[in-house]
């Protein structure tokens, strides 16, 4: 190998090293941008998870409140005015059971009527 070929080889290697150095710089910059974006996304995820938990808690409390209200309404409807009317009819001496409904009680208490009144 003569001096000119050696010199050309060194120049070629120098150009390749320069190109690799530029690529390495670009790669470092890209990695830095990705790290920055990753940190931003992690913070955003934490914020969104907190909001999701808060929303879930609010939703659960609203649902439990609705269940309580519904239970109160159905409780009052089940043992409400209709039940009171049947109890009044029974006290006035009428059957309220499905067997003798509406007929006059002649022999004291009816077990069927009493079991119906005691249902809740």
Swiss-Prot record:
Tell me the subunit arrangement.
Homotetramer. Interacts with both DnaA and DnaN, acting as a bridge between these two proteins.
Q: Does the keyword Cytoplasm apply?
A: yes
Function, as annotated, reads:
Involved in control of chromosome replication initiation. Inhibits the cooperative binding of DnaA to the oriC region, thus negatively regulating initiation of chromosome replication. Inhibits the ability of DnaA-ATP to form a helix on DNA; does not disassemble preformed DnaA-DNA helices. Decreases the residence time of DnaA on the chromosome at its binding sites (oriC, replication forks and promoter-binding sites). Tethers DnaA to the replication machinery via the DNA polymerase beta sliding clamp subunit (dnaN).
Q: Where in the cell is it found?
A: Cytoplasm, Nucleoid
* Top-level taxon in the UniProt lineage: Bacteria
- Lineage per the UniProt record: Bacteria, Bacillati, Bacillota, Bacilli, Bacillales
Carries keyword Acyltransferase? no
Q: Which residues bind Zn(2+)?
A: 95, 97, 110, 113
Entry GO CC: nucleoid
Protein name (database record) = Replication initiation control protein YabA
Q: Which organism is it from?
A: Bacillus licheniformis (strain ATCC 14580 / DSM 13 / JCM 2505 / CCUG 7422 / NBRC 12200 / NCIMB 9375 / NCTC 10341 / NRRL NRS-1264 / Gibson 46)
Region ranges (Disordered)? 57-77
User: What does the note under cofactor report?
Assistant: Binds 1 zinc ion per subunit.
């Amino acid at each position: 190998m003569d001096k000119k070929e050696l010199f050309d080889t060194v120049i070629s290697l120098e150009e390749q090293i320069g190109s690799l150095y530029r690529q390495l710089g670009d790669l470092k910059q890209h990695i830095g941008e990705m790290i920055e974006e990753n940190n931003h996304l992690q913070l955003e995820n934490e914020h969104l998870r907190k909001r999701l938990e808060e929303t879930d808690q609010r939703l659960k409390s609203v649902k439990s409140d609705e269940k309580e209200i519904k239970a109160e309404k159905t409780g009052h409807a089940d043992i409400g005015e209709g039940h009171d009317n049947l109890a009044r009819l029974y006290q006035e001496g009428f059957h309220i059971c499905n067997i003798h409904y509406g007929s006059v009680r002649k022999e004291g208490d009816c077990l069927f009527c009493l079991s119906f009144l005691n249902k809740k």
